[in-house]
Amino acid sequence: MQYVTPDLCDAYPELVQVVEPMFSNFGGRDSFGGEIVTIKCFEDNSLVKDQVDTDGKGKVLVVDGGGSLRRALLGDMLAEKAARNGWEGLVVYGCIRDVDVIAQTDLGVQALATHPMKTDKRGIGDLNVPVTFGGVTFRPGEYLYADNNGIIVSPQPLKMPE
């Protein structure tokens, strides 16, 4: 499904929160949306690896990496696995790598920046807890919509206006 965040903001101004404009679009999908699943981790993508291995149909994985610009929380292998398992997209408050391959993957991916160094795998992090960055709190079970204009969050699913 194609989402246009300005149209959603115009149609649902009382429902949406707009994430501060700090993310770049790296994925093969220009727009994506779905139910939020969250991970809170810092320079350790063990939980990201576990989650992309699950059924993600209709879901967006929001990864709060603490804004770290020192390690990549997502690379081509995890992005390809997420796409195979039906994830709509990922928003990474941190870095990703292998961006040329990710750009060809049928997956929405927004992140702060790129970094070539992978993370450690210590199994540290939290799954499905509220996370806050960009002026918005992302709660599991709420909805996220993203495109080249930005990222918005809603407590309920939104329909594109006709």
From Swiss-Prot:
Keyword Transferase part of the UniProt annotation: no
Biological role stated in the UniProt entry:
Catalyzes the aldol cleavage of 4-hydroxy-4-methyl-2-oxoglutarate (HMG) into 2 molecules of pyruvate. Also contains a secondary oxaloacetate (OAA) decarboxylase activity due to the common pyruvate enolate transition state formed following C-C bond cleavage in the retro-aldol and decarboxylation reactions.
Residues noted as binding a divalent metal cation in the record, renumbered to the chain: 98
What is the protein name given in its UniProt record?
A: Putative 4-hydroxy-4-methyl-2-oxoglutarate aldolase
Q: How many cofactors are bound and how?
A: Divalent metal cation.
Return one Gene Ontology term, BP aspect: regulation of RNA metabolic process
Q: Name one GO molecular function term.
A: 4-hydroxy-4-methyl-2-oxoglutarate aldolase activity
- Check the record and name the InterPro entries matching this protein: RraA (IPR010203), RraA/RraA-like (IPR005493), RraA/RraA-like_sf (IPR036704)
- The Enzyme Commission number assigned here is 4.1.3.17, 4.1.1.112
The annotated subunit structure for this chain is:
Homotrimer.
| Lineage of origin | Bacteria, Pseudomonadati, Pseudomonadota, Gammaproteobacteria, Pseudomonadales
- Broadest EC class? lyase
Family affiliation: Belongs to the class II aldolase/RraA-like family.
Keywords, alphabetical: Lyase, Metal-binding
> Between which residues do disulfide bridges form?
none
- Binding of substrate, residues: 75-78, 97
Q: Which reaction does it catalyse?
A: 4-hydroxy-4-methyl-2-oxoglutarate = 2 pyruvate; oxaloacetate + H(+) = pyruvate + CO2
> Required cofactors, per record?
a divalent metal cation
Q: Which SUPFAM superfamilies does UniProt cross-reference here?
A: RraA-like
Which organism's genome codes for this protein? Azotobacter vinelandii (strain DJ / ATCC BAA-1303)
